[in-house]
From Swiss-Prot:
The keyword Nucleotide-binding does not apply. PANTHER family: BUTYROPHILIN, ICOS LIGAND. This is ICOS ligand. It is a single-pass type I membrane protein. Expressed on peripheral blood B-cells and monocytes, as well as on monocyte-derived dendritic cells (at protein level). It comes from Homo sapiens (Human). The gene is ICOSLG. The lineage of its organism: Eukaryota, Metazoa, Chordata, Craniata, Vertebrata.
């Protein structure tokens, strides 16, 4: 096997795992993140002497690597091709950190960085294991208005989507901020097409005259709690109705006819005024036939 082949480097990598530094980093879905793997400041390296290898710790997936005189990255897994890069300028200074672009939920795992020196007989120069934690904000919970499948029970539904990691769901009695018994709720949590979590929680409680509860979606990694309340009163079951002033039907009809009568009277008055004005205008402007025909002068014959 050639000295500069990826296969040889993989064999060396599998046998050199002692004295590994451990680090943790957190990234949001869709963001870029740097996985640190660097020697002390002031270090200098020759890129024709060092071998650098990044892979996932558990599945041994090849993320990226640097081999002297070999620019091919054909062994890089397709999931990381064009997404995982090292800086040649940084490597000259001993910074072998990995830049990972467009983080996905599937990137949540441990990554191992190994640096070897050929001039030192492939001695390990640096070994770092970085645990990447991935997070995404859940949407603000939507709590449906309660409905009554029976006279003795109320049902609430709470929905939140596109979060990571898997959430915790709590229902809260907002009167005293106590947690409701989780036996009263039924949670459905599943991964959507984006690899993020959607959650639907259904709460069933005994019907009471007044209920003030809240649904809480907890993202442990982000230390984030999103809570939305839902309050009902004695008018449960009448929430879709609009309450008006108690005016009788007869009173409404009488008021309607009164308005119509006034409108009709106004129309009649307006028409009468119009006709009167028209007649007056005609009388003032008409001067008779003498006004429009010049007076004929009679001249007698001598």
């Amino acid at each position: 096997m050639r000295l500069g082949s990826p296969g040889l480097l993989f064999l060396l990598f599998s046998s050199l795992r002692a004295d590994t530094q451990e680090k943790e980093v957190r990234a949001m879905v869709g963001s870029d993140v740097e996985l640190s793997c660097a020697c002390p400041e002031g270090s200098r390296f020759d890129l024709n002497d060092v071998y650098v290898y990044w892979q996932t710790s558990e599945s041994k997936t090849v993320v990226t690597y640097h081999i002297p005189q070999n620019s091919s990255l054909e062994n890089v897994d397709s999931r990381y091709r064009n997404r995982a890069l090292m800086s040649p300028a940084g490597m000259l200074r001993g910074d072998f950190s990995l830049r990972l672009f467009n983080v996905t939920p599937q990137d949540e795992q441990k990554f191992h960085c190994l640096v070897l020196s050929q001039s030192l007989g492939f001695q390990e120069v640096l070994s770092v294991e970085v645990t990447l934690h991935v997070a995404a904000n859940f949407s603000v919970p939507v709590v449906s208005a309660p409905h009554s499948p029976s006279q003795d029970e109320l049902t609430f539904t709470c929905t939140s989507i596109n979060g990571y990691p898997r959430p915790n769901v709590y229902w809260i009695n907002k009167t005293d901020n106590s947690l409701l018994d989780q036996a009263l709720q039924n949670d459905t949590v599943f991964l959507n097409m984006r690899g993020l979590y959607d959650v639907v929680s259904v709460l069933r409680i005994a019907r009471t005259p007044s209920v003030n509860i809240g649904c809480c979606i907890e993202n442990v990694l982000l230390q984030q709690n999103l809570t939305v309340g839902s309050q009902t009163g004695n008018d449960i079951g009448e929430r879709d109705k609009i309450t008006e002033n108690p005016v009788s039907t007869g009173e409404k009809n009488a008021a309607t006819w009164s308005i119509l009568a006034v409108l009709c009277l106004l129309v009649v008055v307006a028409v009468a005024i119009g006709w009167v004005c028209r007649d007056r205008c005609l009388q003032h402007s008409y001067a008779g036939a003498w006004a429009v025909s010049p007076e004929t002068e009679l001249t007698g014959h001598v």
